[in-house]
């Protein structure tokens, strides 16, 4: 388990994973979220790590499904057919 606390207290992120597992669960709490979370808000997403980030990005760009990019963090998001965001991560 890892935990990240914002210096200003605005969020807490907790990462959970089995010791021998390949999967990680990220739980985020936002202090200033105005109401109870509603699943329809799309305040959750899945993230996928790829061995060939550049090729994945090129394919997703060609498909026109990239909805948000954060070059400073080295990540981007695509949308699935239902409009949910999927995070694409480079190798560690």
Regions found by a protein language model. Give the residues of each.
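Vicinal oxygen chelate
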Residues: 19, 39-85, 91
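Core segments of cupin and vicinal oxygen chelate
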Residues: 1-22
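Solvent-exposed beta-strand sheet faces enriched in polar/charged residues
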Residues: 1-4, 28, 70
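Short beta-strand/turn micro-motifs at beta-sheet edges
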Residues: 33-35
């Amino acid at each position: 388990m890892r935990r990240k606390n914002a210096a200003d207290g605005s969020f807490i992120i907790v990462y959970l994973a089995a010791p021998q597992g390949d999967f990680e669960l990220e739980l985020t709490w936002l202090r200033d979220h105005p109401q109870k979370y509603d699943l329809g808000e799309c305040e959750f997403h899945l993230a996928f790590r790829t061995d060939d980030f550049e090729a994945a990005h090129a394919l997703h760009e060609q498909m026109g499904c990239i909805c948000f990019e954060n070059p400073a963090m080295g990540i981007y998001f695509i949308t699935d057919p239902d409009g949910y965001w999927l995070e694409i991560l480079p190798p560690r």
